[in-house]
Design a protein with these regions (language model features):
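FMN-binding flavodoxin-like domain, especially the glycine-rich phosphate-binding loop
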Residues: 24, 55-177
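N-terminal beta1-alpha1-beta2 submodule of the flavodoxin-like/Rossmannoid cofactor-binding fold
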Residues: 1-72, 167-177
Length: 177
């Protein structure tokens, strides 16, 4: 049975990755707005994508609140965001703790992809949060490399999306089918 890709996007990166994944796997990519958990029961593999906002995966409750109903499914979660790859280990631990209160079930695989930030497209709430983050990080006495990078990113557009990043996810799903 074919997998399905579900995504919840705010600025477009997650949708773009979701469509790339669906294209490579020969399946559908569907906006999470139009999906109910009952729709997912027909699939063996569910691939869910959401952007990271303050360490929370956008829309992840579709999966986390229904893990009991999806327990027999292979679940792959992908995130999009601006966290540098050399800081992922620390950040991933925080993301998992914030989104999976009881830990990640064995049948859930998580992948992280670089996203984009176009300052003009941000909502006023996100622009305000970016300014506050920059001010907070810039005021630190001994900022980490990640904090320095985040301060730098606050002033510039950046599109780090890269289709090549999905290759491990594709291999993983194809190996499970």
């Amino acid at each position: 049975m074919k997998p399905i890709v579900i995504y919840k996007t705010k600025y477009g990166s997650t949708k773009e990755y979701g469509e790339w994944i669906a294209e490579d796997l020969g399946c559908s990519a569907v906006d999470a707005k139009s999906v109910k958990v009952s729709d997912l029961l027909a699939y063996d593999t569910i691939i869910y994508g959401g952007g990271l906002y303050a360490e929370i995966i956008n829309g992840i409750t579709l999966i986390t609140k229904n893990l009991d109903k999806l327990k027999d499914k292979n679940i792959v979660i992908f995130t999009t965001g601006l966290t540098p790859s050399d800081c992922r280990d620390y950040y991933d631990k925080i993301v998992i703790e914030r989104n999976f209160k009881t830990g990640v079930p064995d049948k859930v695989k998580i992948c992280n992809f670089p996203g984009k930030m176009m300052l003009e497209e941000l909502t006023i709430v996100h622009r305000t949060a970016i300014k506050a983050l920059k001010k907070m990080m810039a005021g630190k006495e001994n900022p980490t490399e990640m904090e320095k990078l985040l301060v730098e990113l606050c002033d510039h557009d950046g599109d780090f999306s890269d289709r090549a990043c999905i290759s491990d996810l594709i291999k993983y799903v194809n190996g499970r089918e």
